[in-house]
Structures are given as C-alpha cells and as structure tokens.
Amino acid sequence: EPTVHIRFHNGDEVLGNLIGLDTQNVHFSTWFNEQLSAPRGVLQSLAFLSPGFRILYEGPTSMNGWQLGRDPKAWKYRDGVLISEGVGVLGRNFDLQGSSRIEFDLQWNGTFSLIVPVYTSSLDRFDYRSNSYMFYISRGYVSLQRVQSGAGVRNLGQGQIPKMQTKNRVNVELRINKEKAEMEMYIDRELVKKWRDANGFAATGSGISFF
C-alpha cells in the first residue's frame, strides 16, 4: 500500500513509498516501477498518507460496475471518459466507509449543472430519502446540502468558484472527514470552501452518483 502522495509542479502526481530524500533528489517506489528519482526542484509537495489509506477506484476504463438511471442513453463511456448526453443518473458503490478523497476532472460546454451525492445508497436515481451529502456544482459556485430521511434537506452553505466562469475544464477534489463531519472542495488544487455539519456526519451510504 502507498504511504506518500507526491505532487509535481507540472501537475503530475503519484502515490508510492518514500525511499529517501537528500539535498538534490527524492527517491521513491511505485507499483509500476521498482524505484524512481526526481530532482527536488520539480517537487511541489510530499504528504504522508494516513494509516489504512487505500485506493478504492481508478478509472474509468469501461461502464462495468456503474449503474444507470431510467435513461440509459444519458451517459456513455468513451476513451477513458464518462460523458453525459442528457438528464440522467450515473452511480457506483465504492464501499466508502471512513474518510475519503474523491477526485475527478470535469469538462463542459456552455451552461451546466452537476449534482454529486456522496456516501449515498441511491446509485441509479435522485432520491431525497437517501441519507447523503449533495454537492451542487455549476459555473461559478458550489453549494452543499445534507439530505436526511425524516429530517428533510438542509443547506450547509455556498462557495464561489470564479475561475469556472473563464474555463471549461477543472480538476475537482472533495475531501471528506467522516469523524469530524467536515467536507472540503478544491478546484485546481485551490481550496474553494470548507463545510462542517454541526449535527455530526449524517450520510449512511457507501456510493457516489452524478446527476
């Protein structure tokens, strides 16, 4: 299992194991090469991963394992990318249990709206009866809602994303601390918003969906 997360100034990143660090180079191993070295000058950050860290999913490589909603033509897979061509739900059970980091690249044309329920059990439909947290992402802002069966919906706050008004592709990263009931959103490695659910972590599912 990897123990460090290494980021480089050119945007590349790798998970691996640290072998050594001297005044000029960082030495590490990865699953695809026994040992690699890189000059320290190209290194942006090196972070040690928490104990028990594991990679649940890397992809996509196909539609296998993904659940589609009522309109199976709303989503399709092509060349390593999931493409939305209509209004529909796409979900997958990732076996989320503890804290997590969810990362994906998002590209769009024109105006768009994307809802990302996390820690949800509703994978093929949009369901307000499923205990989850829902990120509402559009050009320029993001909002987070807590959805809890029997308690309704509560808006936890909104963050501004001005760079999404001038771009059509960004890297999205969601960091979720289940124990502290805290959630963070990063766009292109920059913190957009941090939320905390004062009532504790309410979501009970283990999947993620896109709508």
Put a short name on every predicted segment.
Residues 193-211:
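Flexible glycan-contacting loops in extracellular carbohydrate-active proteins
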